[in-house]
Every structure is written in structure tokens, then in C-alpha cells.
């Protein structure tokens, strides 16, 4: 057997010795516990704090910090008998105001949190400290807030779950809808243009939907009259004709419309507003369709052509008149 196994370890049978918990205080020589029979006769027994032990206050003196640190570094033997603590002398602080038996090496004032507050040792209970912490985090309903109130008319109204445009007071349910509205109506920029007709849009999705207008495919057919459409939204609007549903009335003349956009365009006749302005000559129009037709004068684009003489026209109404007058077609 190797020699290392024959040598007795110094740590052997340590379980027979009294153990000291890591969280228990280290007793300096001044606080070395003494048996009960060696304590003075007038020493009070702190049965409420230590049922089986008492502490001796006779040798409790304030020592310099250097000597106290050296004494705390030493390991004192565990007490075998009860610990007796004598009454403090005159001039010392009473028991309620005296420091605890184990004094931490740090200060509670230096324990600052990330919220800019510092904790202080609560004199009574821990509940007051937790309550103070929660009030510092979430605020007290009894204390008026120093922050300004939200401007519900600016962007967002929590009570109504709506987003308001500050220029036209139009209401949107999502911030994305408000952003698109501002870019289309108030920014004056429509960066997405159609390569075929030159029509501009404020959003790429609108341009993608517009490209179906130039295609000949009509995949959305009405089941009532058989009319086909290129876009599903156009079919939905067409179905309102069969149901004779006109939920949007004009506030000036009472005329009703199938769509809200048609009603809004109609109100421009009464108000005289012309929000659609030509970027080339500055001429303004009340309808966006009129601006599109006007822009073809500057670009020379003629999307409507006669199948008999291949003559092109900028407006569809001009093509119909040409067929009636030149080719006697209706």
C-alpha cells in the first residue's frame, strides 16, 4: 500500500469538532464567550434573543479599525457553554440603539441601484423597504406626476386606440396607416411610379396592385351579372351596386355613395378644394383621375388606341367619340 495512504490527514475526524457556520459572526477576543458560572451576577439573560445563550458586555469596547480587522480575521473556538453578556456601562448606547452583533464591512448607503436610489437599513420591518422600492419604480398614485400629460390629438390616444393626423385630423387604427397617409397626402412625394402609364404611388404595394390594371387578365368575376374585374377590391365595390348599399352620404347635399373615397371626392365639389397638383405646370385638380389625365399632356402618353386605324388617344372618352364619328361604331 502506498505511503500516502498510511499518513493520517490532519483533517480527519473533523466532524467530532464543533463547526462554525459561514454566516455566523467571528468573535474577537473582546467578545470571547464565557461560561454562565463565570459571568457577573448582575448580567441580564437575553432569553428572547438567545434562548440558551447570553453575551458578556463587560469587555465590549470600541477598538481601532486596524485592530478590529486583525481580530476579525482570527478564528475563535466555538463556545462550549452558554454565552453571558453583561450590562453596558453608562454612556454607551442602549441595547435598542446598539449595533448588531455582526456588523457588516460595507455601508448600506453605498448600495446604490441602477435606478438612482440607495437603500437604507429599515429601522422597523423589511416591508417598508420593499414598499419604498416599489413606489420608486412605479410611482405612487397619491403623488402627482411631474411628466407632462400625453397629447392625445397628436399621434396616439390610449383610450380610443386611434392614431390622429395633426394636419387633417384623419383617424387611423395603426401607426403604419398613419405613416402611409402622411407620405401620400401631406409629404408631396410619391416615389413609386408605373412604367406603363406613369402614375405615381406612395407605397410599393399600391403600385403592385396597379400593374394588374394594364394586364388583360380578369380573374374576379361577379356571380350575379357575370362581369369580370382585374382586382378583388373592384369586385367588392361592384357588389354594392347589386345590393344597392350606399352607406356614405354627403354632408352637404345628402347624396349617398358606395365607398367612402367616392364620397370624399364628391365633397371637393362643395368645398372647392383641389388637393391634387401637377408637378410640372402647377395646375391643381379636385380629382386624382383628372390629374392623371392632365399629366399625359406633358408626357405624350396615349394609352387608348383605335383597333381600326391604330390612332391613339389620351382619354377613353376621346376614343369612343372617334369610333362614333370616324367609323360609325358604338
Swiss-Prot record:
GO molecular function: DNA-binding transcription activator activity, RNA polymerase II-specific; DNA-binding transcription factor activity, RNA polymerase II-specific; RNA polymerase II cis-regulatory region sequence-specific DNA binding; RNA polymerase II-specific DNA-binding transcription factor binding; sequence-specific double-stranded DNA binding; zinc ion binding
Positions where N6,N6-dimethyllysine occurs in the chain: 8
Tissue: Expressed in bone marrow and fetal liver, but also detectable in fetal spleen, fetal thymus, and testes. Detected in hematopoietic stem cells, erythroblasts, and megakaryocytes. Overexpressed in bone marrow of patients with erythroleukemia and megakaryocytic leukemia as well as in their corresponding leukemic cell lines, and markedly repressed in severe aplastic anemia (SAA).
Keyword Magnesium on entry: no
Zinc finger (C2H2-type): 163-186, 192-214, 220-242, 248-270, 276-298, 304-327
Keywords: Activator, Chromatin regulator, Developmental protein, DNA-binding, Metal-binding, Methylation, Nucleus, Proto-oncogene, Repeat, Repressor, Transcription, Transcription regulation, Zinc, Zinc-finger
Inducing factors: By GATA1 which binds to GFI1B promoter in cooperation with the transcription factor NFYA. Target gene of transcription factor E2-alpha/TCF3 that promotes growth arrest and apoptosis in lymphomas.
GO biological process terms on file: chromatin organization; negative regulation of G1/S transition of mitotic cell cycle; negative regulation of transcription by RNA polymerase II; regulation of hemopoiesis; regulation of transcription by RNA polymerase II
GO cellular component term of the entry, any: nucleoplasm
Quaternary structure and partners: Component of a RCOR-GFI-KDM1A-HDAC complex. Interacts directly with RCOR1, KDM1A and HDAC2. Forms a complex with GATA1. Interacts with histone methyltransferases EHMT2 and SUV39H1. Interacts with ARIH2 (via RING-type 2). Interacts with RUNX1T1.
Official protein name in the record: Zinc finger protein Gfi-1b
Organism: Homo sapiens (Human)
Source taxonomy: Eukaryota, Metazoa, Chordata, Craniata, Vertebrata
Gene: GFI1B
Amino acid at each position: 500500500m502506498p505511503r500516502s495512504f498510511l499518513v493520517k490527514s490532519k483533517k480527519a475526524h473533523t466532524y467530532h469538532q464543533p463547526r462554525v457556520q459561514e454566516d455566523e459572526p467571528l468573535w474577537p477576543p473582546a467578545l470571547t464567550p464565557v461560561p454562565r458560572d463565570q459571568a457577573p451576577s448582575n448580567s441580564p439573560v437575553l432569553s428572547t434573543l438567545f434562548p440558551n445563550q447570553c453575551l458578556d458586555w463587560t469587555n465590549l469596547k470600541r477598538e481601532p479599525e486596524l485592530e478590529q480587522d486583525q481580530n476579525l480575521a482570527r478564528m475563535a473556538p466555538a463556545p462550549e457553554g452558554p454565552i453571558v453578556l453583561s450590562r453596558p456601562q453608562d454612556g454607551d448606547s442602549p441595547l435598542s440603539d446598539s449595533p448588531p452583533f455582526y456588523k457588516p464591512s460595507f455601508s448600506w448607503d453605498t448600495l446604490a441601484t441602477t435606478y438612482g436610489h440607495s437603500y437604507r437599513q429599515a429601522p422597523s420591518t423589511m416591508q417598508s423597504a420593499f414598499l419604498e422600492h416599489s413606489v420608486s419604480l412605479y410611482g405612487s398614485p397619491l403623488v402627482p406626476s411631474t411628466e407632462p400629460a400625453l397629447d392625445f390629438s397628436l399621434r396616439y390616444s390610449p383610450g380610443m386606440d386611434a392614431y390622429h393626423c395633426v394636419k387633417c385630423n384623419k383617424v387611423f387604427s395603426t401607426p403604419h396607416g398613419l405613416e402611409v397617409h402622411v407620405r401620400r397626402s401631406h409629404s408631396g412625394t410619391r416615389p413609386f411610379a408605373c412604367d406603363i402609364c406613369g402614375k405615381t404611388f406612395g407605397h410599393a404595394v399600391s403600385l403592385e396592385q396597379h400593374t394588374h390594371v394594364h394586364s388583360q387578365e380578369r380573374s374576379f368575376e361577379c356571380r350575379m351579372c357575370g362581369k369580370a374585374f382585374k382586382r378583388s377590391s373592384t369586385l367588392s365595390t361592384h357588389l354594392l351596386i347589386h345590393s344597392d348599399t350606399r352607406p356614405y352620404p354627403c354632408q352637404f347635399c345628402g347624396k349617398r355613395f358606395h365607398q367612402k373615397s367616392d364620397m370624399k371626392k364628391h365633397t371637393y365639389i362643395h368645398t372647392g378644394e383641389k388637393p391634387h397638383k401637377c408637378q410640372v405646370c402647377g395646375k391643381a385638380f379636385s380629382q386624382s383621375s383628372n390629374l392623371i389625365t392632365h399629366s399625359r399632356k406633358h408626357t405624350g402618353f396615349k394609352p387608348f388606341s383605335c383597333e381600326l386605324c391604330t390612332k391613339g388617344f389620351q382619354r377613353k372618352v376621346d376614343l369612343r367619340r372617334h369610333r362614333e364619328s370616324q367609323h360609325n361604331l358604338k
